């Protein structure tokens, strides 16, 4: 299929004229048959490659040769055909130049030396070549970057400074959530400790809470407290005493100096003995 297309393009380029011709409209199509050069009819000259295929029209050429303007040198048919093969629809007469449109016709100065026009012969010697290579500008335009991709000079530098090694307490500060400041303490998974160092577990019936030892002192010092005993004397049920004089011996025996307690008891015994009748 590609070879057929290449052969068709090759044939079209070989049959096309190599000399650019003026584009004629439909109203000026009669100028192909009738050329306004001294009111003489001219034969229809085909394009360059077809001149060797069709014989010339002898009747029109004889009439044209008889009606030549006197004073001009006769021009042979072979030379005229050769000129017609070079430039279609144009015949060069010595001392006179005619155009296919017939609008411009001027007399050349015989004193000036006439240089013969160098025109290309038919496509017999020149082989047309067809290039299918894409231009370099179009190939460069196809290279584009997507929107989400960074250009080489826009990529951020990924050099991150290594932070110094952190201790366990600093890592615990970073991992601690913000709601610990409001009193809620989540249950942290701690490593297994020996039996001697294990902390007591929270007992909901007795109301004992273990001390938080893993929390650093600078984060929340108010949370580090000693073990609090919420146990009441009657196992969680508070019953007020009905006696008028509360007994203070239970609370002061452990915290008061025993020497002071002796003096107080002696004074109390004296006052009791004085009050009795």
From Swiss-Prot:
In this chain, the stretch annotated as Disordered covers: 103-124
Signal sequence region: 1-15
Record InterPro entries: Odam
Taxonomy, superkingdom? Eukaryota
> Modified after translation how?
O-glycosylated.
Coiled-coil residues are none
Instruction: Spell out the residue ranges making up region: Interaction with ARHGEF5.
Output: 127-129
Its biological purpose? Tooth-associated epithelia protein that probably plays a role in odontogenesis, the complex process that results in the initiation and generation of the tooth. May be incorporated in the enamel matrix at the end of mineralization process. Involved in the induction of RHOA activity via interaction with ARHGEF and expression of downstream factors such as ROCK. Plays a role in attachment of the junctional epithelium to the tooth surface.
Its subunit composition reads: Interacts (via C-terminus) with ARHGEF5.
What's the name of the protein?
A: Odontogenic ameloblast-associated protein
Please report the organism this UniProt entry assigns to the protein: Bos taurus (Bovine)
Q: Which gene encodes it?
A: ODAM
């Amino acid at each position: 299929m590609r070879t057929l297309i290449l052969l068709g393009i090759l044939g079209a380029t070989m049959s096309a004229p190599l000399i650019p011709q003026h584009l004629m409209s439909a109203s000026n199509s009669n100028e192909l048959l009738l050329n306004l050069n001294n009111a003489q009819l001219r034969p229809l000259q085909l394009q360059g490659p077809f001149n060797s295929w069709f014989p010339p029209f002898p009747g029109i050429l004889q009439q044209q040769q008889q009606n030549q303007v006197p004073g001009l040198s006769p021009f042979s048919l072979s030379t005229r055909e050769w000129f017609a093969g070079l430039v279609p629809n144009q015949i060069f007469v010595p001392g006179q130049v005619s155009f296919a449109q017939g609008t411009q016709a001027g007399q050349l100065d015989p004193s000036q030396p006439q240089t013969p026009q160098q025109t290309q012969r038919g496509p017999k010697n020149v082989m047309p070549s067809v290039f299918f290579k894409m231009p370099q500008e179009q190939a460069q335009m196809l290279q584009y970057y997507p929107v989400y991709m960074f250009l080489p000079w826009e990529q951020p530098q990924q050099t991150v400074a290594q932070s110094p090694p952190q201790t366990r307490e600093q890592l615990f500060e970073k991992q601690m959530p913000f709601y610990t400041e409001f009193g809620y303490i989540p249950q942290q998974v701690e490593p297994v400790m020996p039996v001697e160092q294990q902390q007591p577990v929270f007992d909901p019936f007795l109301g004992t809470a273990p001390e938080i030892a893993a929390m650093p002192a600078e984060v929340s010092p108010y949370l580090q407290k000693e073990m609090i005993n919420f146990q009441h004397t009657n196992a969680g049920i508070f019953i007020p005493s009905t006696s008028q004089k509360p007994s203070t011996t239970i609370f002061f025996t452990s915290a008061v100096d025993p020497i002071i307690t002796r003096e107080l008891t002696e004074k109390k015994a004296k006052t009791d003995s004085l009050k009795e009748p």
